[in-house]
């Protein structure tokens, strides 16, 4: 008899296959009783169109898998998707180049059931495993599937696809009575994913649709072995004092008795602070036959669980990331039967509504971490297009995020493997987790079985997230939950002891229990830089505040649309024909945007038409791919910088402060031209460096709404002796104005507006520069250069309100930049051995100097690290070091000025070559220097 996985305190063990409560097993990998199937032998994968035998036959030990695809577990411990299996076995080399994916597999153009024949049928996943020792209980743990699955063990069906469905719903089956000595076999028949009818996942409009709809297994399939007592589901419920002076920790662990007789054991808990003395407590627990008991350790019963002066976990810009270790064990007769181990952090999160205001009558969402108000500054996460998880790739992207200065990553659905959260904990990056929009997660009614999957998913997700200090909130997406969904989810989260905070929507919606979300969304396509400073335009008839994207409140997803990578990156994924279309045909559908065709109004993002139209009108027409890419870099830079700076600048507004911006999206799971701050090869283009500049820890902002200067301190300590100098130049390099603030002192997270008001030109059609120089105790710590026109961008608000892109009355006239004279640039570079992010072991230091004899600006100067020769010549082909991670770039210098940039990289990336730095710019010819 199959028992529901939702809401049970115990279930019969040892009576044959059945579905057991999620509490029977840790969601983490830190249990000695749990192992990942396929870790040793891998998996065999094949379409049912070829493997036509029955599940009973395929799951029989000794079944021949000759000709099947061989697939190891990925870095998250799972066999992955069907397309991933094909790629690993040689199908479609260079799948992301141009339209290779479409050529190899076909293309879907609508989210829904798979329309590609080879993926519209079930596929088999098969692996062998060894029997546990005699007398040991064995449970099969399926941690969700993308699609639905029939499960077979040793010739017997354990579960049907009616039970095993849901990307995050955990199912546990007792298979003790099915196993034989020696080799045993598991076969899983994966039925095609349909995100419009299943509680799974999809890619919305973020990219091309994966040809297999991501059908497969993205989380580990596990075997839990133990007897007679098994400990699991261990976690900490913390109550931390408001002033952070103490933290009372309640520890809970479930102990399961797998035998037919009552059992007594000693349950021990050890909490170890970083570098500190372990705290160990224990108690005896008697568990009835074939049942599970929650053993609780409270601070009142065990006073040592109240920690005085705890080590507090902070976001990386504010402090350290100490992680405590929680270890539990169950023993009988002095012998430990099994144990668990995982980490947790001590910190507080405060979520509130600030306001109200005319635009936001219920207030706007705001967050404090450890009582410190912070402006959330982040981006949306997109996993690999085929859900291939690689811990090294996560580490590389963390390096990119921290170098960029963002503090948050948002998960809209696509919840991640355990390693991902562990890395975010260690890195100090905040995680805004939640459900996905626009699919079955937002359906308004479910069957009884679907209700069960929804609640089981929430419980499993809660178990995964609850101990991770990086996860500071969980929210629904576009739509607020129905009353039924809200109850199911909150019941599931409560069963997991996951405290949230929970937000009812990513838009300005509300739900019966959680109330007002206080968030908004959009825009998603090109808007001018000064759009981000708007605080007064919104659609009064749209209560969700969609596309009211100015810098007020909390915007859960927004950006200026398409981003153009560097030429190095473009050459890795666009064919010559693709490249020609990129710079010659703005209305062309770009395969590496998404599947939406050639529309460019409303919610259609398949072309770069709106971006290109703005570039043409603002900077002038281009005559080559390289010129187009350069102009796009400049425009992307100024737009992303403005988005993040505006939200910091307006965080001081009292009525409706800017409290957070999530760039849509931070990354992509494939090479892209749409919504990304860095490409999947680590490419750092103009969009990246614009955000990086905006998020410098001590930074000056030229506010585009009132032409004054703001200074902010986004670091964790007070900065005193700070001055801000504002210099205004014309395009000939003449200084038109030069003002310096008085000495300033800024506490952590302090934002000071109007510290300087530079005098800028007013004559018509005049292009000018503003250079901001921040010094502390006389030392330069921040440079920020703007280019602007007295012919400004003017948004047609009556036509723009409610739209995902701006309709323009007038574009800024920056075409005079085309006439800048050539500048003379020199550079020096040195390399030292130094550890860096993601395995980097070298640091290159580059000093770029403008040596022009006349006052000619060196505009938008970029340095790149390349493979070359000892004489300073670049090697041919793709010579960029993709592991390089830059501290700053795309800088602008006047004669006599220098800027020192640094980059970390992996020496192995040189492949025996000499490191060479190239420097080029808008009006500077390319030079190369050896980084000796």
Residue positions per predicted region:
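Accessory beta-strand-rich segments of carbohydrate-active enzymes
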Residues: 16, 27-30, 47-49, 77-78, ...
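Substrate-binding clefts and catalytic carboxylate motifs of secreted carbohydrate-active enzymes
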Residues: 35-51, 145, 213-216, 542-720, ...
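Terminal connector regions
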Residues: 307-340, 758-811, 904-932
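Active-site-adjacent substrate/metal-binding segments within catalytic domains
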Residues: 80-128, 136-141, 147-152, 162, ...
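Intrinsically disordered, low-complexity Pro/Gly/Ser/Thr-rich segments with frequent PxxP/GP/PP motifs
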Residues: 280-310, 733-764, 878-908
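Substrate-binding/catalytic cleft of secreted carbohydrate-active enzymes
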Residues: 408-598, 635, 639, 650, ...
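Beta-strand-rich binding/interaction modules
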Residues: 153, 246-287, 293-295, 707-745, ...
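Accessory carbohydrate-binding/adhesion or oligomerization-edge regions at the termini
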Residues: 14-107, 187-198, 217, 223, ...
């Amino acid at each position: 008899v199959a028992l529901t996985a939702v809401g049970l305190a115990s279930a019969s063990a040892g009576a044959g296959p059945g579905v057991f409560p999620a509490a029977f097993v840790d969601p983490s990998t830190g249990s000695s009783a749990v192992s990942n199937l396929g870790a040793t032998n891998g998996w065999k994968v094949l379409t049912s169109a070829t493997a036509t035998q029955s599940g009973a036959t395929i799951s029989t030990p000794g079944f021949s898998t000759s000709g099947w695809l061989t697939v190891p577990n990925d870095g998250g411990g799972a066999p992955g998707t069907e397309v991933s299996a094909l790629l690993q076995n040689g199908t479609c080399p260079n799948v992301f180049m141009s339209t290779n994916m479409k050529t190899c597999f076909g293309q879907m153009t609508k989210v829904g059931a798979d329309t590609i024949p080879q993926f519209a049928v079930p596929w088999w996943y098969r692996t062998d495993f060894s029997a546990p020792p005699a007398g040991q209980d064995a449970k099969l743990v399926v941690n969700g599937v993308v699609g639905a699955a029939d499960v077979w063990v040793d010739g017997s069906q354990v579960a049907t696809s009616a039970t095993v469905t849901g990307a995050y719903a955990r199912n546990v089956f007792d298979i003790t009575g099915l196993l034989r000595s020696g080799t045993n076999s598991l076969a899983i028949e994966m039925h095609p994913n349909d995100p419009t009818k299943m509680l799974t996942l999809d890619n919305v409009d973020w990219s091309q649709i994966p040809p297999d709809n991501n059908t497969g297994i993205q989380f580990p399939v596990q075997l839990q072995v133990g007897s007679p007592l098994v400990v699991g589901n261990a976690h900490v419920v913390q109550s931390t004092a408001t002033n952070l002076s103490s933290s009372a920790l309640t520890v809970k662990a479930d102990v399961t008795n797998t035998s037919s007789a009552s059992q007594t054991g000693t349950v021990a808990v050890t909490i170890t602070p970083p570098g500190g003395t372990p705290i160990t407590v224990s108690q005896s627990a008697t568990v009835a036959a074939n049942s599970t008991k929650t053993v609780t350790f409270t601070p009142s019963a065990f006073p040592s669980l109240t920690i005085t002066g705890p080590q507090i976990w902070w976001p990386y810009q504010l402090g350290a990331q100490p992680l405590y270790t929680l270890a539990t064990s169950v023993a009988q007769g002095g012998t430990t039967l099994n144990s668990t181990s995982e980490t947790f952090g001590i910190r507080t999160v405060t979520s509130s509504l600030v306001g109200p205001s005319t635009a936001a009558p219920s207030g706007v969402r705001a967050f404090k971490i450890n009582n410190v108000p912070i402006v959330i500054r982040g981006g949306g996460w997109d996993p690999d297009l085929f859900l291939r998880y690689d811990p090294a790739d996560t580490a590389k992207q963390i390096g990119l995020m921290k170098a960029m200065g963002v503090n948050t990553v948002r998960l809209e659905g696509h919840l991640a493997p355990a390693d991902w959260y562990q890395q975010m904990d260690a890195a100090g990056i905040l995680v805004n987790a939640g459900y996905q929009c626009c699919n079955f997660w937002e359906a308004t009614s479910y069957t009884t079985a679907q209700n069960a999957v929804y609640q089981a998913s929430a419980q499993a997700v809660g178990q995964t997230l609850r101990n991770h200090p990086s996860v500071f909130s969980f929210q629904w997406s576009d739509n607020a939950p129905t009353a039924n969904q809200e109850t199911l989810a909150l019941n599931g989260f409560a069963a997991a002891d996951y405290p949230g905070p929970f937000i009812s929507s990513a838009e300005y919606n509300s739900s019966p229990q959680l109330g007002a979300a206080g968030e908004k969304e959009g825009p998603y396509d090109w808007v001018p830089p000064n759009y981000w400073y708007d605080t007064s335009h919104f659609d009064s008839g749209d209560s969700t505040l969609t596309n009211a994207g100015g810098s007020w409140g909390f915007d859960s997803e927004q950006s200026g649309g398409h981003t153009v990578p560097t030429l190095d990156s473009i050459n890795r994924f666009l064919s010559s024909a693709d490249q020609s279309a990129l710079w010659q045909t703005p209305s062309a559908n770009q395969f590496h945007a998404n599947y939406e065709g050639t529309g460019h109004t409303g919610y259609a993002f398949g072309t770069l038409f709106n971006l290109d139209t703005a570039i043409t009108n603002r900077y002038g027409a281009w005559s080559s791919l390289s010129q187009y890419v350069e102009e796009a870099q400049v425009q992307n830079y100024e737009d992303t910088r403005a988005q993040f700076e505006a939200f910091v600048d307006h965080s001081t507004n009292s009525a409706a402060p800017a409290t957070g911006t999530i760039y849509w999206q931070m990354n992509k799971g494939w090479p892209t031209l749409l919504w990304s701050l860095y490409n999947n090869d680590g490419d750092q283009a103009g969009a990246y460096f614009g955000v990086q500049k905006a998020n410098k820890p001590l930074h000056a902002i030229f506010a585009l709404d009132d032409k004054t200067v703001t200074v902010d301190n986004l670091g964790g300590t007070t900065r005193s002796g700070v001055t801000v100098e504002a210099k205004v130049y014309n395009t000939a390099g003449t200084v038109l104005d030069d003002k310096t603030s008085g000495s300033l002192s800024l506490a952590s997270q302090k934002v000071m507006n109007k510290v300087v008001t530079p005098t800028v030109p007013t004559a018509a059609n005049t292009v000018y520069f503003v250079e901001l120089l921040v010094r502390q105790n006389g030392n330069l710590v921040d440079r920020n250069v703007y280019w602007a026109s007295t012919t400004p961008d003017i948004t047609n608000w009556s036509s723009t309100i409610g739209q995902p892109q701006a309709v323009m009355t007038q574009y800024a006239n920056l075409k005079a930049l085309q006439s800048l004279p050539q500048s003379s640039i020199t550079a020096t570079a040195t390399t030292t051995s130094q550890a860096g992010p993601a395995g980097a072991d070298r640091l290159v230091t580059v000093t770029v100097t403008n040596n022009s004899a006349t006052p000619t600006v060196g505009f938008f100067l970029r340095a790149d690290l390349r493979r070359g020769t000892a004489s300073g010549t670049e090697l041919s082909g793709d010579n960029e070091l993709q592991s390089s991670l830059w501290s700053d770039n795309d800088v602008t210098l006047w004669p006599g000025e220098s800027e020192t940039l640094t980059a970390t990289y992996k020496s192995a990336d040189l492949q025996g070559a000499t490191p060479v730095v190239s420097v080029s710019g808008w009006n500077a010819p390319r030079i190369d220097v050896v980084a000796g």
